[in-house]
Amino acid sequence: MSEEQPIKWTTYLAGGMENVSKKEMIDFRETFMKKLQHEDLLIYSPVAQEASKVGANPGDHIKHIQGLKRGGHWDIFFERMWKIWFGNINQNTDLIQLGINLRMRKHIDGNRRSEIVSWGDFEAVIRSDFIIVYHPTSIKTVGTHFEVVFAFLFRIPIYLVVPDAPPTESNSSLIFGTQISNNKAIRVFRTINECVTQVKADCKLK
């Protein structure tokens, strides 16, 4: 049996989770995964990966987390959230050094499809070549903003899709974060198709 080879490109699909409907959470990610499916591209969808870490169906894992919070089960809540964000990494780990180490591991060893089941969302972003952020202005989200910060700290390119507003009407800090990652360029799209076209061109996916 041949050894599994690293995948050329890796991306992370960021967007609303907790304050959107299950359909809204899943649909845009499935669309991206279908349109960008390619042997040279590894796509990390946090919906499926987070759900597997808490033993729930994709999309339903949000209710599981909310139930722990509303029931006052804070210790279990923390354990589940740590699992979602950091996988099996020790909770006492220096997170700054962790990010540096994970980024170096991506550059030295590459990423393989079989590995992503053990990644938390933090590792998935840090080990990405670029991330895709779907961010309607009406959506309330915090986790997505975490992911944008992780990306721009490591200068990981960000493709931002804002379907309901032009860049001039989008959140200023969000736009600025993408500029940090994109060498000051504005890489903001109004539609998924526009974003997909640009990703395919940049990564030479045919």
Task: Pin down the residues of each PLM region.
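Conserved catalytic or regulatory cores that recognize and/or transform ribose-phosphate-containing ligands
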Residues: 1-206
